[in-house]
Amino acid sequence: MEVKAIHRGARISAQKTRLVADQIRGLPIERALNVLTFSPKKAAGIVKKVVESAIANAEHNEGADIDELKVKSIYVDKATSLKRFTARAKGRGNRIEKQTCHITVTLGN
C-alpha cells in the first residue's frame, strides 16, 4: 500500500528543500517527524506539513495503521520562478527570481 501527498508551488528553493528531504528518506514515520520537528531549517516545517498530510491520507482513505508506515520516497522538483525586479542606480533594474518547488512524499510499508 502506498499513500501520496503533493505540495505544489512551495515558496522555497528546491536545492534547500532537498537537504531536508534527504534526511528523512527511508525513515519510519515517528522518527521522520522527530527529525523535522527539531530541524532549524525553514524547509523542515514545509516538508513536515506534507508528511502529516500523507499520514492523514493514509488514515482516512486507506485505513492504514500509521505505526507501520515509513517514508518510502520523497523527492523535490523545481517549479516555476516568480520574476521580480529591484531598482538599481541610474534608472536600471536587476531581475530577482524567487524560486518555487514541488514536494512529493510517498508513504508505504
UniProtKB/Swiss-Prot annotation:
GO cellular component term, pick one: cytosolic large ribosomal subunit
GO BP annotation list: translation
Position of the signal peptide: none
Domain of life where this protein originates: Bacteria
InterPro entries per UniProt: Ribosomal_uL22, Ribosomal_uL22_bac/chlpt-type, Ribosomal_uL22_bac/org-type, Ribosomal_uL22_CS, Ribosomal_uL22_sf
A single GO molecular function term of this UniProt record: structural constituent of ribosome
Role noted for this protein: This protein binds specifically to 23S rRNA; its binding is stimulated by other ribosomal proteins, e.g. L4, L17, and L20. It is important during the early stages of 50S assembly. It makes multiple contacts with different domains of the 23S rRNA in the assembled 50S subunit and ribosome.
Name the UniProt record assigns to this protein: Large ribosomal subunit protein uL22
Organism name: Cupriavidus taiwanensis (strain DSM 17343 / BCRC 17206 / CCUG 44338 / CIP 107171 / LMG 19424 / R1) (Ralstonia taiwanensis (strain LMG 19424))
